[in-house]
Amino acid sequence: MGGFRAMKVHVVDNGGQWTHREWRVLKYLKVDTKIIPNTTPFDELEGVDALVLSGGSPRVALETERMGRNGEYLDRAGFPILGICAGMQFMTNHYGGATAPAKVPEFGKTTLHVDDEDDLFVGLPRTFTVWESHNDEVSVLPKGFKVLAHSDNCSIEAFRIEGKPFYGLQFHPEVENTEHGYDIFKNFLKVVDSWMVR
């Protein structure tokens, strides 16, 4: 389906309503994948080539104890990580940035504007529809984070950590209402594929 070498990508369950959709997209793309509790020790992730940090319930990214070992994964991973919604917000907080209640909480369809295609948005339109479901948003980016996309109500919809294959998305690419969602996952898997040969 994706033309990638065999790879293992686990989805870290942070209690999000669409965690199974993330797993299902990866399965559809012929990736060896499973959902794991966010309490899984990093040392038990033997042979994993990448992680997807799922979304979670409202404000969960601010409640560190409910995010399990996500911080450990970020500190120790030498492979790509994609944080979605609460996963993205946790990444921001973990590296010294900040999240805050959104000026305009986003639920449903919104228009995404790609500012920098980087690797994640290669080959995609500069503007397309995505699905949102968040009360909080990234308010302060840590040093070394690069904004990749925004919407009219949210100035940071996607980022990359410079020098690392770590990405964050505020919107939900796994939801069918997001245009090009599968393509975003495919582009992430291309990053994983290229990282595997290093």
For each feature predicted by the language model, list its residue ranges.
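Short, Lys/Arg-enriched N-terminal segments with co-localized hydrophobic residues
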Residues: 1-6
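Flexible gly/pro-rich beta->alpha loop and the following alpha-helix that scaffold active-site loops
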Residues: 8-10, 16-84, 95
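Active-site flanking residues adjacent to catalytic metal/cofactor-binding acidic residues
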Residues: 12-13, 171
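Pocket-forming structural segment of enzyme catalytic cores
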Residues: 68-84, 89-183, 187-191
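Generic C-terminal helix-cap and adjacent flexible tail
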Residues: 190-198
